[in-house]
Regions:
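Catalytic active-site module of serine/aspartate enzymes centered on a nucleophile-bearing elbow/loop
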Residues: 367-392
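Conserved alpha/beta-hydrolase "acid-adjacent" motif
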Residues: 334-340
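Gly/Ala-rich beta-loop-alpha elbow adjacent to hydrolase catalytic centers
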Residues: 167-175
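Catalytic nucleophile-loop/oxyanion-hole region of alpha/beta-hydrolase
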Residues: 105-113, 126-164, 179-182
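Short beta-strand/loop motif that positions the catalytic acidic residue
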Residues: 321, 327-329, 333
Length: 392
């Protein structure tokens, strides 16, 4: 009996030890799993504080981390701001793709965001891509985006040989276009974007007529700010062949200015007898207000113009995006409908869209009355930062 009791006791101890080992394995597994989220949340706090006007929070974040190292150098032939974290690399890299702003990489908000990413432990590159500081986007802009991404991924201080593409507005669209390029396969860890467009034809329709068509053909009214019309017009005129017509129309738009409440009024009232056929068709589209005429006017554009426009539309090509895509937008963005983000599922199976009232296009607005909106945006940032470090 004593031997049996001893055997039972021994078996009981073995069972308890086995249970302890299983429990320990579960705890360790959960710790490893959740630690990456805790780590990403801490980094998200650093990044978000860089774009919020919260002096106490910003001062605490700056005191907790080392001072980033800022430098300027050309990247793939484009002037760029490069911000490195304190300490030794390599680091996970972020290519911050700007929208259309005259100040480009020198805009204080852009520099603050780049420094926030660097304080959070990321190598950040912010180039001035062709056209963006002049309020236009062209195939040359898209090509330069791809070239910069390739060069950043190959930097010796880039961890894992991959770069995360983080874009705002048209910059987010450029990031998506680059991620479609087969030349960058295996060189991108993530695309994270705020308020992109996916189909420039839809954007043209909204900018000129205030409407767009859903996939089922229904016309939807969508009100946007006048600046969209200005950028769309400058980009469309830039597709014309170099010559007098392009110079004339670009000068007329430039005279109206980016702050004009009616940037297309001059084109809508001008005669077109002095213009060639291609320029006439461009003015005809930009001057039109009737959404039912849009399709015919778009079809009348020169073949070269429509080809250039398709090169600026992620949904127009046959490429696929194989990396995770995190997108965030407001419920009614002042430029691009949320449907522009949702539609990307066709080319980006790992696409996730966050809609939050904390975003007013590229601006983060936070109020005590709607902390849930900030929490939703925070979750978007946490997921993005965690994925960007997955190879670290």
């Amino acid at each position: 009996m004593q031997g049996k009791d001893a055997a039972q006791g021994f078996s009981g101890r073995r069972l308890r030890r086995l249970l302890y080992l299983v429990l320990l394995a579960v705890v360790v597994g959960l710790s490893i799993s959740y630690w990456s989220w805790v780590d990403a949340q801490a980094r998200a706090l650093v990044v978000i504080s860089s774009v919020l006007d919260t002096p106490v929070l910003t001062a605490a974040v700056e005191a907790a981390g080392g001072e980033p190292l800022r430098s300027s150098a050309p990247v793939a032939g484009n002037p760029a701001l490069i911000v490195r974290p304190a300490g030794e690399g390599p680091w996970p890299a972020i290519f911050l793709v700007n929208g259309t702003v005259p100040e480009g990489r020198k805009l204080p908000a852009v520099r603050n965001l780049a420094e926030g990413f660097a304080r959070a432990g990321y190598l950040v590159v912010v180039p001035d891509l062709p056209g963006l500081t002049e309020d236009r986007i062209t195939p040359r802009t898209a090509d330069a985006t791809t070239q910069v991404a390739r060069e950043v991924s190959a930097k010796p201080d880039t961890a894992g040989g991959k770069v995360a593409l983080v874009g705002v507005s048209t910059g987010a669209t450029l990031a998506l276009l680059a991620a479609e390029d087969p030349a960058l396969r295996g060189k991108i860890s993530l695309v994270a974007g705020v308020a992109p467009y996916s189909n420039i034809k839809t954007v043209l329709n909204i900018a000129t007529t205030g409407h767009y068509r859903r996939p089922d053909g229904e016309l939807v009214h969508y009100e946007v700010t006048p600046f969209l019309s200005y950028v769309v017009a400058r980009s469309l005129v830039a597709t014309l062949p170099s010559g007098e017509d392009r110079r004339t129309l670009a000068a007329e738009l430039g005279a109206a200015g980016r702050e004009s409440p009616h940037p297309l009024s001059g084109l809508r009232s001008r005669q077109t007898d002095d213009l060639g056929p291609g320029a006439k068709s461009v003015v005809g589209l930009l001057a039109n207000r009737d959404p039912k005429r849009f399709e015919a006017l778009y079809a009348a554009l020169p073949d070269e113009t429509r080809q250039d426009l398709e090169e600026l539309s992620p949904l127009a090509g046959t490429g696929k995006i194989s990396v995770p895509v995190e997108l965030a937008t407001g419920p009614h963005d002042k430029y691009f409908p949320p449907s522009q983000s949702y539609g990307l599922v066709r080319i980006a199976p790992e696409r996730r869209v966050t809609v939050t009232g904390a975003l007013d296009h590229a601006e983060l607005n936070v109020s005590l009355e709607d902390m849930q909106a900030l929490a939703t945006f925070d979750a978007f940032v946490v997921r993005s930062l965690r994925t960007a470090r997955v190879e670290d």
